[in-house]
């Protein structure tokens, strides 16, 4: 086990699947204690049990709809009690929809904005009180390459992830100018091999994951889909004291796509 995050106490939303699981596993491997929150409590508890089997008492699970303000207040209070402090927040939970501006419904627009953008505002706002008591701290907000580059087929997702990008900078400036030792940064992955890609397979009209990957990697110079660990390594760096002079940045994990 490493020690890059020894003594750190992290809240990770969307901790039952995908990137949340990869980040939680790597945080624990590096010595952190984690509180996994998810609307799927059973899934989050399963991951917490797995982590506790490797190091007893390193993980807990909490039911949490990230679009609900009161649930944010409750989940953070419980996590703070469970871990005796919070100094890392990973706003990872998110959803996506496909469809042009003419196809997208207002209901879907509001849902994506609530889960992907409002949740980050709520997390940053309500975690701050705990993080100020446990400095230094790090806020890591999961945006997307789609928050920097638009596509005709995902207006709601583009808008929500772009909001996360600039909100992260606003929070970084607030903390820095307030004298808080709390950093705020955003991560911007391209296509990562998680369950969210399943919906893209159908939208592309292809039948196999191999066909899907071939289509999706056409614009990626490294010609591959990202792995969850690619994002988790970045999260460990931003959570650790190794990045103590880094705040307000967008870290792109895109296989060179944005370099073109």
Map each language-model feature to its residues.
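Canonical Rossmann dinucleotide-binding motif of NAD(H)/NADP(H)-dependent dehydrogenases/reductases
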Residues: 3-35
């Amino acid at each position: 086990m490493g020690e890059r995050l020894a003594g750190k106490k992290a809240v990770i939303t969307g901790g039952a699947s995908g990137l949340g699981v990869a980040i939680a596993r790597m945080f624990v491997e590096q010595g952190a204690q984690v509180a996994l929150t998810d609307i799927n409590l059973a899934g989050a508890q399963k991951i917490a049990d797995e982590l506790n089997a490797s190091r007893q008492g390193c993980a807990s699970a909490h039911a949490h709809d990230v679009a609900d303000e009161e649930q944010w207040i409750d989940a953070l209070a419980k996590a703070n009690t469970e871990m005796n402090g919070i100094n890392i927040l990973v706003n990872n939970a998110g959803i996506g929809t496909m469809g042009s501006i003419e196809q997208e419904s207002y209901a879907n627009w509001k849902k994506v904005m609530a889960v992907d953008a409002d949740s980050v505002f709520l997390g940053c706002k309500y975690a701050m009180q705990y993080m100020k008591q446990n400095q230094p701290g790090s806020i890591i907000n999961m945006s997307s390459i789609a928050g920097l580059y638009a596509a005709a087929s995902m207006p709601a997702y583009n808008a929500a992830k772009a909001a996360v990008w600039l909100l992260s900078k606003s929070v970084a400036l607030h903390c820095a100018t307030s004298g808080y030792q709390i950093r705020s940064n955003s991560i911007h992955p391209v296509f990562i091999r998680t369950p969210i890609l399943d919906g893209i397979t159908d939208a592309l009209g292809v039948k196999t994951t191999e066909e899907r990957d071939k289509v999706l990697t056409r614009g990626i110079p490294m010609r591959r889909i990202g792995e969850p660990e690619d994002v988790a390594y970045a999260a460990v760096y931003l959570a650790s004291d190794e990045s103590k002079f880094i705040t307000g940045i967008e870290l792109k994990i895109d296989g060179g796509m944005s370099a073109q």
